[in-house]
UniProtKB/Swiss-Prot annotation:
It catalyses: (6R)-5,10-methylene-5,6,7,8-tetrahydrofolate + NADP(+) = (6R)-5,10-methenyltetrahydrofolate + NADPH; (6R)-5,10-methenyltetrahydrofolate + H2O = (6R)-10-formyltetrahydrofolate + H(+). This is Bifunctional protein FolD. PROSITE patterns: THF_DHG_CYH_2. GO terms for cellular component: cytosol. InterPro entries: Aminoacid_DH-like_N_sf, NAD(P)-bd_dom_sf, THF_DH/CycHdrlase, THF_DH/CycHdrlase_cat_dom, THF_DH/CycHdrlase_CS, THF_DH/CycHdrlase_NAD-bd_dom. NADP(+) binds at residues 165-167, 190, 231. It comes from Bacillus cereus (strain G9842). Gene3D superfamilies: Leucine Dehydrogenase, chain A, domain 1, NAD(P)-binding Rossmann-like Domain. The keyword NADP applies. Keywords: Amino-acid biosynthesis, Histidine biosynthesis, Hydrolase, Methionine biosynthesis, Multifunctional enzyme, NADP, One-carbon metabolism, Oxidoreductase, Purine biosynthesis. Belongs to the tetrahydrofolate dehydrogenase/cyclohydrolase family. Pathway: One-carbon metabolism; tetrahydrofolate interconversion. CDD domains: NAD_bind_m-THF_DH_Cyclohyd (cd01080). One of its GO terms (biological process) is tetrahydrofolate interconversion.
Length: 286
């Protein structure tokens, strides 16, 4: 058996086409979705991510505003910029590109963003609403992962989901989203003693640890859905995931590649959240 490859780039493009149609309808009502991205410093990776977000906004018709601030900016000045954007009716979503310089407390910055504009889904209020199954902005990568699994037409309810990794950005929230879909969820992490045995029980395996090709065929239940969140660069310069793709391909039922798997879905779900925020606000732009 050779696994079906879940092409995240194709799923993302399909969803972006739907978003484009939604934005056209909103603009007919005088509503223009707007996203503000704050970039602090000159980190090349952060700048690359921001460019991808700007390109995505342009593609679907979202107004985007990039605020570039120096590495030396004070926390107070950054908080004041967020306050300004919180009060700007043209802006439906505020995203602060992470990581931030060491002298700025990330927690304070995230908590300053209005929950109504928290399109990253990182604010504690957003997290609390997600945990209790309320309507809220879902974190983009975990939301994208659930959407990719749904593309397989697998009924998630009752399935065993194993999440390898427990980061606040991917591991913890993605498990909660699957729990909200009535799956049974097991978390594995660096202190888990029987990871291989637990992994082999998974109908759906999510891997987000940042270790190249860590997961091999002997971790996989035959026919399982395998979602590889890792993005690692080998010495050759080639990108690879946390899953040994070629090794697992003949055991899994479905698998995401790296690149063109989970990555394209992250920005797409950010665009989705921004459009949803604009719908909720319903502010007509003059």
């Amino acid at each position: 058996m050779v696994a079906v490859i879940i092409k995240g780039n194709e799923v993302a493009e399909k969803k972006r086409a739907q978003l484009t149609e939604e934005v056209v309808k909103l603009k007919e009502q005088g509503i223009v979705p707007g996203l503000a991205v704050i970039l602090v410093g000159e980190d090349p990776a952060s700048r690359s991510y921001v460019k991808g977000k700007e390109k995505g906004c342009e593609q679907v018709g979202i107004y985007s505003e990039l605020i570039e601030l120096p590495e030396t900016i004070t926390e107070e000045r950054l908080l004041a910029e967020i306050d300004r954007l919180n009060g700007d009716d043209r802006i439906n979503g505020i995203l602060v590109q992470l990581p931030l310089p060491k002298h700025i407390e990330e927690k304070a910055i995230i908590e300053r963003i209005s929950p109504e504009k928290d399109v990253d889904g990182f604010h504690p209020i957003s997290v609390g609403r997600m945990m209790t199954g309320q309507d809220t902005f879902l974190p983009c990568t975990p939301h994208g992962i659930v959407e990719l699994v749904k593309e397989t037409n697998l009924d998630i309810s009752g399935k065993h989901v194993v999440v390898i990794g427990r980061s606040n950005i991917v591991g913890k929230p993605v498990g909660q989203l699957f729990l909200n879909e009535n799956a049974t969820v097991t978390y594995c992490h660096s202190k888990t003693q029987n990871m291989k045995e637990l992994s082999k029980l998974a109908d759906i395996l999510i891997v987000a640890v940042g270790r190249p090709k860590m997961i091999t065929a002997d971790y996989i239940k035959e026919g399982a859905v395998v979602i590889d969140v890792g993005v690692n660069r080998l010495e050759t310069g080639k990108l690879c995931g946390d899953v040994d793709f070629d090794n697992v391909l003949n055991v899994a039922g479905y698998i995401t590649p790296v690149p063109k798997g989970v990555g394209p879905m992250t920005i797409t779900m950010l665009l989705h959240n921004t459009v949803e925020s604009a719908k909720r606000a319903g502010v007509v732009c003059k």
